[in-house]
Regions:
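Short, amphipathic alpha-helical "recognition" segments used to contact nucleic acids or chromatin
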Residues: 101-119
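Conserved H-loop
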Residues: 8-9
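Short, solvent-exposed alpha-helical "recognition" segments
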Residues: 135-146
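Conserved AAA+ ATPase small/helical "lid" subdomain
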Residues: 49-103
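Short alpha-helical "recognition helix" segments of helix-turn-helix
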Residues: 123-126
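DNA major-groove recognition helix of helix-turn-helix
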Residues: 80, 128, 139-140
Length: 146
């Protein structure tokens, strides 16, 4: 008899149960770079599937890097698919805001925090929906007030 078992919850198994298997193989050997590449592939797939043409890989990578470490492919797929699928079809950049919210638990409204997270003024405009000129002015005023 050959029994093959797979799980994402290996660490929750009792050691006595694990000893009953002749072999235990760990396939979770993804580097963070591998996981970023996988997340980009999922993004491309879902943008095509949901007919969203606007893509900014640099911004996508910055948002994804807020997750440390990046989750494994199954979780990446769900995260990206949900952000794209439930985004506003009339706003091709809405999935960035949804992705940011899902990852941070916060709406991308605090422009100072976005700047601290190394987003550019253009990227802050996309995430916050505040015009670039207003973002630049507010950031300048914050610096002058310090």
């Amino acid at each position: 008899i050959v029994l093959v078992a797979t799980t994402n919850l290996y660490e929750h198994f009792d050691k006595a149960l694990i000893r009953r298997f002749d072999s235990v193989i760990d396939f979770n050997r993804y580097s963070q770079s591998d996981l970023m590449d996988i997340s980009e592939e999922y993004l491309n797939k879902f943008l095509t599937k949901f007919n969203l043409a606007k893509k900014d890989i640099r911004l996508f990578r910055k948002i994804m890097m807020l997750l440390s470490p990046l989750p494994y492919p199954g979780d990446l797929k769900n995260l990206i698919k949900t952000a794209v699928a439930f985004s506003n079809p009339d706003d091709e950049l809405d999935y960035f805001r949804r992705l940011y919210y899902t990852i941070t638990g916060e709406k991308p409204e605090d422009i100072k925090k976005l700047q601290e997270q190394k987003f550019t003024i253009r990227e802050i405009e996309i995430l916050s929906k505040i015009p670039k000129s207003s973002v630049a002015r507010e950031l300048k005023e914050m610096i002058e007030d310090e």
